[in-house]
Amino acid sequence: MTEKRAKFTKMMDGDAEDYSIIAASNADDYNHLADKVLDHLRMLENDYGGFQVDRLTHSLQTATRAYRDGRDDEYVVCALIHDIGDNLAPANHAEFAATILQPFVSEENYWIVKHHGIFQGYYFFEFLGLDKNMRDKYADEPYFESCREFCEKYDQNSFDPNYDTLDLDFFIPMVKELFQKPKRSIYLQS
């Protein structure tokens, strides 16, 4: 069976039937979105970036620490994929991950993921000739303390090859649940 496709070659020539076909196809994308996110997360395996553990293990360890600390599933998934952009968007990995998460998570969790790169810099920027207190420019933001805590409790300490890290299979149900349906999007009617 051939997939239904719009008739137009220029969007300005599309009609209601065309956009109905496209909307149905886009809605079906959510059935596979979690699997795509997980596939990309798996691409971090064996990518050490100079650390003692690979980037996938770091991500799993960050999520494991958040889970064991009693964080809710949304927060744990944010911890899991906070560095998903490390190998595709190394110059802005935090923003990359935050953009993926934004339609599905709270404003606070989005802000944490978006800014964790700068907040994580507190632990190493000085060794690169950068200002370790760069995060202080956000001191008056409502989620400053949440992001600081995320980096301190879960992110900066998750490079331990001896830590009892949960495997990816443990987190798959949480990822699938989170990415089922966006909470907000320009494509959703209010």
Positions of PLM-derived features:
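Metal-dependent phosphohydrolase cores
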Residues: 1-80, 84-190
